[in-house]
From Swiss-Prot:
Glycosylation: residue positions: N336, N402, N608, N816
SMART domains recorded: AAA
EC number from the UniProt entry: 7.6.2.2
Species the sequence originates in: Entamoeba histolytica (strain ATCC 30459 / HM-1:IMSS / ABRM)
Biological process, per Gene Ontology: transmembrane transport
Designated name of the protein: Multidrug resistance protein 4
Residue span(s) of domain ABC transmembrane type-1: 55-368, 722-1030
Coiled coil: none
TM ranges: 48-68, 125-145, 196-216, 223-243, 299-319, 342-362, 721-741, 773-793, 849-869, 871-891, 945-965
Keyword set, alphabetical order: ATP-binding, Glycoprotein, Membrane, Nucleotide-binding, Repeat, Translocase, Transmembrane, Transmembrane helix, Transport
Protein role: Energy-dependent efflux pump responsible for decreased drug accumulation in multidrug resistance parasites.
Length: 1310
């Protein structure tokens, strides 16, 4: 089956030529500012195959819409067949009707003639039903295939457009908002293009055909009925305008909520450490409340609009009932109009107007799709000023690497009043290494970005080999550059793939070349010791690796490109001392023959630069070689002195010591491989236990959601009981309207059939009058019921979706960190599910519940009426119903099954989307936009193949649903006529026989009409079932998250708390494995104790377990063996919020949120604690951040941008330190807290941290040994074990591993 499906998919792919979006942007008229696109613009990406599918689908929809009222033509003929007035004209006189020799043959002949005529008409109706079934098949198949193809195509174009946008554009847009749109907006576009668009054509055509037939049969009667049309059109127009307005406003706020979700879910360690889960949930909830407010307004608008429409429709019928009697009395020479004609007019117009009630949902969905397309197409249409996809620009045959910055002036687009570079002049000749040093925020990294052409200068020019960068092809330019940034970005793939991503376009390095680059970056050794080697998955954002390991892989990725220009922005800041020395030598070697620009705070790494430029407030104030600047004794000299640099290292001695250390590590690694865990107290079955825990949890969740459909409905009623109760009443009442309305139509028809003169009898007048009054009452009831079951249920459904979205986000926010480490819970997957799954729940909530109640009520009342008037006919017709119900059920099941692989694929593509957009600058610097586009495209292959697998099945069962629904009508007439013929008393005189015949016809007609409405209701249920199937699947996914109880619950109120926390930390025989990597033991029996107020430093090579130890203290994870104690209390027994409120943490990669500087610092305040602005200023001063914050145009109210993109790395780090200090913690965890700071800031901040550490228990992870010399104890960790411990001097005297590290950093050691 899969082979055949793939073949069909590939065959269709031949025709899958997507129009170029740039060409379309030039040809198409841009969407206006109405917030919505036109229908033509909506289908702008349809190629000729899609247009054929659209045309055929519309043809099928029109066929369905036309054939349904056409069946009523046949029904009119059936009515006229029973016209007793015409039948009685066969008798010459009144006496003959009572003569047995006349009336007995006549009675037999009449029933035979009627039966034969009915049978012929039944055959015609069956043909119409078959035609409708074929039309339904074409509509379902074509719209399903076309909408899925368009959805996939728009997803790909939107993703490609996001990768294309320049850095300036991203400064104004949060990545979370952008990525959430692909899950919500694109899905809504796809829904609007699906079968629901076909239903609009079907109901519209049915409306037109119904009125057309009405005009053809009796134009003035139809015109009278249409007299209310202006009011109907006005109601529908106002409905559409306001519904679209509220949709646009709601979607904007939903995008803002998505941005919050992505920013927090992507940085859960920071959120948990700050204890800000509740605060972010409140922020998210506030955005969702705005969405709910607009959605409720939309729901009430739709309910009022449709209620008004139904009221005017019923008013039109009341007026028409009166005028029909006038027509049949022969007024105006219209005697040729029959009762059958009147019935045709009424039923056709009834079908036409009933379509208006059905069209509301698809119209609302279509309006939403157009509003969503407006936002998506705006992004797709945008051609950035710096276009990485542009083929324009010169591509020189060779690049020498001469870089010139001439009078460069620059301001960031988001801060146009803040001058970053003011007239910068800098010349770098081929092969030179130029170092940029200076305080954080002085313009060093900005210069790097200008050389990459992430931005263009606002004044002056940047040139390469004498050519302005703006005149060069952007892709060619970036292919000449290798970049290693301050915060290393890795992608969620293998180490091999991450390194290979650095290769130039069109080049595929060999395995040997890749390994050589890894060796140059000092990465090969640690990679080789990983269980999977180069095939090890690095996790989301490289979470499976330490900071230093990530940095080394990033360096290897840059080296494999063999760039002409090498840009190193703090390239070794995250490395341990041993790695830094080796990697620095590798970088210096790699720089030979290349133009290299180095941004560094560690001045030891730039001493050998050809030239060193000292930046200050966007200008170069000193430049020269190291020795020249030292002789100058200016700013650079002061920076060097602050770092306490001494004489050069004895290289030979260091290399010998490093060789010994490597031999020791390799020997230890061999012992570990031979005796895994035999020397620890860790449970030998721990690996199997970790796997069993995961499998057990998944099984438990699956079992708990078995009755998810009932749960959603009950949840809706429980929380929105007022709206749901009145909506339920409205649905029940609305279900009674059309069945009782059909009784009045039959009464009207029978009354009209009895008119045989120009004068109405008193009974006929009373009947007409009563019918008119009752229809008006039905109109009022329709207004109330439609408002209640559509408006109130729609509002309740929107509120439920908002509540589920909030509950889902709330649950995500309190999951333990190990849950986020799983592949299926990566940021892209979770944000995709958060955006799409609650929206899909509309299929089993809101107006869908109202529709189901309305349909069930209609079926119930209709069947009750049918059985009351003719149980035999009803029972015979109902024999078809079980088959119809089975078909409807299978149809829903198929839709649910079809949604599973598609949803999984969209989640997979969402992972690629989020990581590429979040790291778009890295993607663009690597010129790997097409690579990620292909990965994204490949992830969408499954739903693309699934289109051709599921479309035929779904279409067949939809065809059967339509066919069976419409066959019930002629089948009922056939059975009814048969029973009339069989039960007729032929011995009665003609008048009595005709009365009995007429009575039986009336009863049969009422029963059949009621059953027809019941069947149509089941058919309408068939249109809803596909959404129900998809919604059930989404509900299971949603409640999987909501129901999950984390092992470490940050919301839990359980656990001990105690006063007078001292801050004493103790590790007792700690063993640890990450749950997602149970085969890899990270910590192997570590024990140490940190007394109150003491400082313990953890040092060692990257990946040895230092940061893991800090995460255990924060209780991000629990150890697999041993205990972590706080003041003698096992932290597992402590309240988790209480524990974390005692800890202040500054991580290696600072995480800021898209809010003001003051709000970011305030994030450090524990829950329930109030701080003044003065306290915030004091914390900022301690972190040496107050001065640069105050210098910003808006001071502490300055927005830092998405993930702090608007400020430098050093500025981010200082704000993060201020955020930790304002907590006034008992325990201070500093994981490379000063790694991103310049020398001047580092000295001041280190003094501040030393001061802050007094009286506090402090655990420091640092590669710069100068920052930990005064620690009370230093623990040297090697491969998960403490190899050495002692004070700085004790470890130097030991002359072991620490001694070697010290020699590397300080040269000679006293």
């Amino acid at each position: 089956m899969s082979v055949t499906t793939n073949a069909v998919a590939d065959a269709f792919a031949v025709f899958d030529v997507t129009p170029d979006p740039d060409e379309l942007a030039r040809k198409n008229k841009k969407p206006d500012d109405s917030g919505s696109v036109t229908v033509r613009q909506l289908y702008r990406y349809a190629n000729w195959l899609d247009l054929i599918l659209l045309a055929v689908g519309i043809f099928g929809s029109i066929g369905c819409g036309v054939l349904t009222p056409c069946q009523m033509l046949v029904m009119g003929d059936m009515v006229d067949t029973f016209n007793t007035n015409d039948l009685m004209k066969a008798f010459p006189n009144q006496e003959a009707m009572y003569d047995p020799k006349y009336y007995i043959p006549f009675n037999h002949e009449v029933t035979k003639t009627v039966a034969d005529t009915i049978n012929d008409l039944v055959l015609k109706m069956v043909c119409f039903a078959i035609g409708s079934g074929v039309g339904s098949f074409l509509m379902t198949f074509c719209f399903f295939v076309m909408s899925e193809r368009q959805g996939i195509k728009i997803r790909m174009l939107y993703f490609r457009a996001l990768l294309r946008q320049d850095a300036g554009w991203y400064d104004f847009h949060e990545s979370g908002e952008l990525t959430s749109r692909i899950a919500s907006d694109v899905q809504q576009i796809q829904d609007g293009m699906s079968q629901k668009f076909g239903i609009i054509f079907q109901t519209t055509t049915s409306f037109i055909a119904g009125y057309a037939i009405g005009f053809a049969k009796d134009w003035d009667l139809t015109l009278v009925i249409m007299s209310m049309s202006p009011f109907i059109v006005l109601s529908m127009t106002l409905l559409a305008v306001f519904a679209t307005k509220f949709t646009v406003l709601g979607e904007e706020s939903l995008g803002n909520a998505g941005a919050i979700a992505e920013a927090t879910i992507g940085n859960m360690r920071t959120v948990h450490s700050l204890g800000q889960e509740h605060e972010f949930c409140e922020m998210y909830n506030e955005k969702i409340r705005v969405v709910d407010r607009y959605n409720v307004l939309k729901g009430l608008t739709v309910g009022l609009g449709l209620g008004a429409v139904m009221f005017f429709i019923m008013g039109a019928f009341s007026l028409g009932s009166w005028y029909a009697s006038v027509v049949l009395r022969g007024k105006g020479g219209k005697k040729n109009v029959t009762a059958g004609d009147v019935m045709i007019v009424f039923i056709c117009v009834l079908i036409a107007t009933q379509g208006l009630s059905i069209i509301a949902i698809p119209l609302n969905i279509f309006a939403t799709a157009k509003a969503s397309a407006y936002r998506i197409y705006q992004t797709i249409d945008r051609i950035p000023d710096i276009d990485c996809r542009s083929t324009a620009g010169e591509c020189p045959t060779e690049c020498n690497g001469n870089i010139t910055l001439e009078d460069v002036q620059f301001r960031y687009p988001t801060r146009p009043t803040k001058q970053i570079l003011g007239g910068l002049d800098l010349e770098i000749k081929k092969g030179q290494t130029v170092a940029l040093v200076g305080a954080s925020g002085c313009g060093k990294s900005t210069t790097i970005q200008l050389v990459q052409r992430n931005y263009d200068p606002v004044g002056g020019s940047v040139k390469l080999d004498g050519k302005d960068l703006r005149d060069l092809n952007i892709k060619w330019l970036r292919n000449q550059i290798g970049l290693v940034g301050q915060e290393p970005i890795l992608f969620a793939c293998t180490i091999r793939e991450n390194i290979m991503l650095g290769a130039r376009d069109g080049e595929t390095p060999t395995e040997e070349e890749m390994i050589e680059c890894a060796k140059m970056a000092n990465a090969h050794e640690f990679i080789s010791h990983l269980p999977e080697g180069y095939d090890t998955m690095v996790g989301e954002k490289g979470a499976a690796l330490s900071g230093g390991q990530k940095q080394r892989i990033a360096i290897a990725r840059a080296l494999i490109r063999k760039p002409t220009i090498l840009l190193l922005d703090e390239a070794t800041s995250a490395l341990d001392t041993q790695s830094e020395k080796i990697v620095q030598q590798a970088l210096e070697k790699a720089s030979q023959g290349r133009t290299t620009i180095v941004v560094a705070h560690r001045l030891t790494t730039v001493r050998n630069a050809s030239r060193i430029c000292v930046f200050h407030q966007g200008e170069i104030i000193e430049q020269g070689t190291h020795q020249e600047l030292m002789d100058l004794k200016g700013t650079y000299y002061g920076l060097v002195k602050r770092q306490s640099m001494e004489e050069e290292v004895d290289q030979e001695t260091v290399e010998n010591d490093l060789k010994k250390i490597r031999e020791q590590e390799n020997k230890e690694a061999e012992e570990i491989n031979q005796h895994k865990n035999t020397d620890t107290n860790e449970d030998p079955d721990i690996v199997q236990k970790l796997e069993n825990e995961y499998n057990s949890e998944m099984k438990k969740l699956k079992h708990s959601n078995r009755f998810v459909l009932l749960r959603v409905i009950l949840d809706n009623f429980r929380h929105e009981w007022f709206l749901s109760t009145f909506g339920f009443i409205g649905g029940i009442g609305g279900g009674a309207i059309f069945p009782f309305f059909t009784l009045k139509i039959v009464d009207l028809i029978m009354c009209l059939l009895s008119i045989n003169s120009d004068t109405l009898t008193d009974d006929q007048k009373d009947t007409i009058k009563n019918i008119c009054i009752i229809v008006v009452v039905i109109g009022v009831a329709s207004f109330l019921s439609f408002f209640m079951y559509i408006g109130l249920f729609l509002s309740a459904g929107f509120k439920m979706i908002g509540r589920v979205r909030k509950d889902m986000y709330h649950s995500i926010m309190h999951q333990n960190i190990s849950w986020f480490d799983r592949k299926e819970n990566m940021v892209g997957s979770l944000t995709t599910r958060l955006a799409s799954d609650p929206t899909t729940l509309q299929g089993i909530s809101g107006e869908r519940v109202g529709n189901v109640i309305h349909i069930i009520s209609t079926i119930g009342f209709a069947l009750g009426i049918a059985f009351y008037y003719d149980w035999k006919v009803s029972l015979a017709v109902m024999a078809v119903s079980p088959v119809l119900i089975v078909v409807v059920f299978i149809n829903g099941k198929l839709n649910s099954l079809e949604a599973c692989p598609a949803q999984a694929a969209y989640e997979k593509s969402g992972i690629t989307l989020v990581e590429a957009v979040e790291s778009v600058r890295t993607v663009q610097s690597l010129t790997r936009e097409e690579h990620f586009y292909e990965v994204f495209k490949d992830a969408l292959r499954e739903p693309k193949i699934g289109i051709y697998k599921w479309a035929p099945l779904l279409s067949i069962f939809m065809c059967l649903t339509t066919l069976l629904t419409q066959v019930m009508n002629p089948y009922g007439f056939y059975i009814g006529t048969y029973l009339i013929k069989k039960k007729s008393n032929y011995d009665l005189p003609v008048p009595d026989f005709m009365i009995e015949f007429s009575d039986r016809f009336e009863e049969m007609q009422k029963a059949i009409m009621a059953v027809i409405f019941a069947a149509q209701a089941v058919g309408n249920l068939g249109n809803i079932v596909p959404d129900i199937g998809k919604a059930v699947r989404a509900a299971k996914n949603t409640y999987d998250v909501i129901d999950r109880k984390p092992t470490i619950d940050c919301y839990s109120e359980e656990g001990e708390t105690f006063n007078d926390v001292k801050g004493e930390i103790e590790f007792k025989d700690i063993c640890f494995r990450y749950p997602t990597r149970p085969d890899n033991s990270v910590l192997k029996g570590i024990s140490f104790k940190v007394e109150q107020g003491k400082t313990v430093a953890l040092v060692g090579a990257s990946g040895c377990g230092k940061s893991t130890s800090v995460q255990l203290i924060e209780r991000f994870y629990d150890p697999t063996h041993g205990d972590v104690l706080l003041d003698g209390h096992n932290i597992k027994d402590l309240n988790i919020h209480f524990l974390r409120s005692q800890i202040g943490m500054v991580g290696q990669e600072p995480v800021l949120f898209a809010e003001s500087v003051m709000d970011n610092i305030r994030r450090g305040v524990p829950k329930g604690v109030e701080v003044s602005n003065e306290q915030i200023y004091a914390a900022a001063k301690m972190a040496n951040a107050h001065d640069f914050i105050s210098a910003m145009p808006e001071g502490y109210n300055t927005m830092v941008g998405d993930r702090g993109a608007q400020i430098s790395g050093g500025q981010k780090q200082r704000i993060a330190i201020a955020r930790a200090l304002i907590r006034n913690p008992k325990v201070l965890l500093l994981d490379e807290a000063t790694s991103a700071l310049d020398s001047e800031s580092e000295k001041i901040v280190q003094d501040a941290l030393d001061k802050a550490a007094k009286g506090r228990t402090t655990i420091v992870i640092a590669h710069r040994l100068s920052t930990i010399q005064n620690a009370d104890q230093i623990c040297v960790i090697m491969r998960g074990r403490i190899a050495e411990r002692g004070t700085h001097q004790e470890l130097l005297d030991l002359k072991g591993f620490y001694y070697t590290l010290a020699m590397q950093q300080f040269g000679t050691v006293d």
